[in-house]
């Protein structure tokens, strides 16, 4: 049984409050930055790098030294601490406001809450959070919700007092007696794997280190577990091992090793629990699956279909066949089926064809039904197919921008679909839908502390036209009464990489912006998959600049439509979206009054040239390989760090985590130092490093709000909003 979908209530049950006083927009800044405060500077040590006859000089390359424990390791920490102190000094006038914002954000969280239970293998599973606690308690009840509660794992007992704590995995054995738990206490995504006896509450004596969190699979014998070990240099999972609970991990057996370090691997069970699956994927360009009968854990995994460049597929088991979702002769994917003993592609038979305007995002199997998740123009639609008579229908939703998604549906033998729904004005909601009668029941809508009326807010959907004629969707939300006269500040957010779709979802924190007059806009730019697979392909590799152009063109569109005006436009993005921030800041520094770049990936050439840096090799087909001359110079033409120039830059807030395993701390650190050296303006650059966190930021539902309060205080200060 897979508990990784049992999100902590702190994350999955966002609730909000709203105050009646909508703040007006201040066009004349009343906030005053402290005067005479010198920004941190650091020494320059030229480091020359040569490729394809091109010489790059990195004066701040030495900042890589922290994890290398090199001679400059201490200097790195000193510099990061100096930057943190500078943030505190520059934001000192807003210290009280930040505290008020934190209290405001925290005040919207229902401190004692519980998720909607779902049933699997005779038990009802749910999470709950307790008042004043940071982490979730994972629970279950046998057969009926009136049964006594059993605590599977209390994350507060383990995580409280630790600088960082994260749980991933929580896989329960088929006999319901054991649970595998993955835990990270450093934020490097290196999870230690432990096993707990749910009958006695005792832990098995062994611990397995450096595993892939959430990628564990029990065999049907209730004692064998398959798990993934990560390479300590690249932090990529590369080996699958078989472990027998209660034995020394030194005796574990390696069942698979990925020889191509560009691939990501995973392990899991089919929904039917009949098979254990090992997956290997390469940047949405290639995939390969191996399967093993779960009742024969010591057997040999069989290759479903050999990896072929350009062929992507995923599988699930249903009765006497496998279903295969694939891009085989199908840009937007199609659904196929094949017999259990004939799994190579020549035996695949089409069930749902490819469609030019619809991306087949996924499918969920039931005894008598199949639910297909389909993405069309940025909106996810749920299509229900009756397996008996092949009749079909769609679930209907009436808001202009929303997210509908299949929820946790562990039970195979049911006519009930659990699905989730939310929009920019509708809090997260959980429904049960009868696939035969076509009726739905609201099981829970995230409670609104203090009362919330969605009619006080307006959500819209529009299309900006990019410079090459593409229609780019934008999802918009603002407080009712906001006039489209150009006077309001606007925060534009986007991601635009890896084919990751950005959805129009609800966020309680966002109300602090809307209630003070901000318009919030989500841009569905190329590099994501909102408009189909071609939308992704048109925003990666040698097409990456389309991502940046789309974002700029969306901002220009919103100005023309008078949602805002120049001087009141703010941009925000994180990780690969942080690269977007760096690129658009270089390309159009005049367009933004402020930019927020969270854990930004900004030193593209240097990172992609070092296969020892975590995740590099697995992303050659996303960004390019600098060993290729054409790709090298294209990446160099937009890499934020390489394109910092002597010119005016907007106000910028940059955040990172010292232990970030995905975008190393030194990328934003070097970027800040170089911009400070080169910029010709008097705007401020703030750089905040969480010395204990990684890529996901602080752990704990309250600690993370401190980061949000800092970002909002920064934006409000630039608008002259001080309360």
For each feature predicted by the language model, list its residue ranges.
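Active-site-proximal cap/loop segments of hydrolase catalytic domains
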Residues: 522-723
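Secondary-structure transition/capping motifs at alpha-helix termini
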Residues: 144-146, 186-188, 199-202, 219-222, ...
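Cap/lid segment of the alpha/beta-hydrolase catalytic domain
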Residues: 156-170, 181-188, 202, 433-439, ...
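C-terminal substrate/ligand-recognition segments
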Residues: 326-328, 361-377, 464-473, 499, ...
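Beta-propeller folds
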Residues: 9, 18-416, 420, 424-428, ...
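Glycine-rich His-Gly loop
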Residues: 129, 327, 422, 493-497, ...
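Sec-dependent signal peptide recognition
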Residues: 2-9
């Amino acid at each position: 049984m897979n508990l990784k979908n049992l999100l902590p209530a702190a994350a999955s049950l966002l609730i909000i409050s709203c105050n009646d006083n909508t703040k007006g927009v201040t066009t004349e800044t009343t906030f005053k930055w402290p005067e005479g405060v010198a920004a941190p500077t650091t020494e320059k040590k030229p480091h020359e790098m040569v490729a394809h006859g091109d010489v790059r000089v990195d004066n701040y390359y030495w900042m890589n030294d922290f994890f290398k424990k090199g001679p400059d390791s201490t200097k790195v920490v000193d510099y990061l601490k100096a930057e943190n102190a500078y943030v505190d000094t520059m934001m000192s006038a807003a210290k009280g406001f930040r505290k008020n914002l934190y209290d405001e954000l925290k005040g919207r969280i229902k401190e004692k809450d519980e998720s909607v239970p779902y049933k699997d293998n005779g038990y009802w599973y749910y999470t709950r959070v307790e008042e004043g606690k940071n982490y979730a308690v994972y629970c279950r009840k046998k057969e009926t919700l009136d049964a006594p509660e059993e605590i599977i794992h209390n994350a507060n007992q383990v995580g409280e007092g630790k600088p960082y704590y994260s749980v991933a995995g929580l896989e329960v054995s088929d006999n319901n007696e054991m649970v595998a738990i993955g835990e990270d206490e450093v934020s490097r995504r290196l999870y230690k794997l432990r096993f707990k006896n749910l009958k006695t509450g005792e832990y098995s004596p062994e611990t397995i280190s450096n595993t892939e969190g959430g990628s564990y699979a029990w065999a049907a014998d209730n004692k064998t577990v398959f798990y993934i070990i990560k390479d300590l240099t690249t932090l990529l999972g590369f080996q699958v091992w078989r472990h027998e609970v209660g034995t020394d991990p030194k005796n574990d057996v390696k069942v698979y090793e990925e020889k191509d370090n560009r691939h990501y691997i995973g392990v899991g069970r089919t929904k039917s629990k009949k098979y254990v699956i090992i997956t290997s994927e390469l940047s949405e360009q290639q995939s390969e699956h191996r399967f093993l009968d779960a009742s024969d854990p010591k057997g040999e995994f069989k290759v479903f279909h050999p990896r072929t460049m350009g062929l992507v597929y995923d599988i699930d088991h249903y009765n006497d066949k496998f279903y295969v979702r694939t891009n085989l002769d199908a840009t937007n994917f199609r659904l196929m089926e094949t017999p259990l003993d004939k799994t190579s592609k020549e035996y695949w038979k089409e069930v749902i064809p490819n469609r030019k305007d619809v991306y087949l995002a996924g499918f969920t199997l039931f005894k008598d039904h199949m639910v297909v998740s389909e993405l069309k123009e940025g909106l996810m639609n749920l299509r229900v197919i009756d397996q008996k008579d092949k009749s079909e229908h769609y679930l209907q939703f009436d808001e202009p921008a929303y997210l509908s998604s299949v929820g946790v549906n562990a039970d195979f033998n049911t006519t009930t679909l659990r699905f989730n729904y939310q929009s920019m004005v509708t809090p997260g909601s959980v429904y049960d839908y009868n696939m035969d009668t076509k009726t739905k029941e609201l099981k829970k809508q995230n409670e609104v502390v203090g009362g919330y009326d969605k009619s006080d807010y307006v959500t819209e959907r529009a299309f900006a036209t990019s410079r090459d004629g593409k229609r780019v969707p934008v999802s918009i939300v603002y407080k009712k009464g906001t006039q489209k006269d150009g006077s309001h500040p606007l925060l534009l957010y986007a991601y635009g990489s890896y084919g990751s779709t950005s959805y129009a979802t609800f966020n309680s924190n966002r109300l602090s912006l809307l209630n003070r007059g901000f318009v919030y806009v989500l841009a569905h730019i190329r590099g994501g998959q909102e408009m189909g697979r071609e939308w992704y392909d048109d925003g990666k590799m040698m097409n990456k600049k389309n991502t940046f152009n789309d974002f700029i063109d969306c901002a220009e569109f919103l100005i023309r439509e008078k949602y805002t005006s120049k001087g009141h436009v703010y941009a925000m993005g994180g990780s690969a979206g942080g690269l977007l921030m760096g690129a658009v800041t270089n390309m159009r520094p005049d367009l933004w009054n402020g930019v927020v770049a969270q854990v930004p990936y900004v030193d593209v050439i240097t990172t992609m040239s070092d296969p020892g840096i975590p995740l590099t090799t697995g992303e050659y087909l996303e960004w390019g390989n600098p060993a290729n001359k054409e790709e090298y110079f294209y990446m160099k033409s937009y890499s934020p760090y390489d394109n910092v120039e002597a010119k005016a830059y907007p106000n910028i807030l940059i955040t990172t985590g010292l232990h970030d395993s995905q975008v190393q701390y030194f990328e934003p650190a070097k970027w800040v130092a170089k911009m400070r050296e080169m910029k010709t303006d008097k705007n401020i650059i703030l750089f905040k490093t969480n010395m204990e966190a990684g890529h996901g930021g602080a752990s704990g539902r309250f600690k993370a709000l401190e980061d949000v309060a800092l970002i909002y205080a920064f934006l409000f200060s630039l608008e002259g909003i001080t309360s």
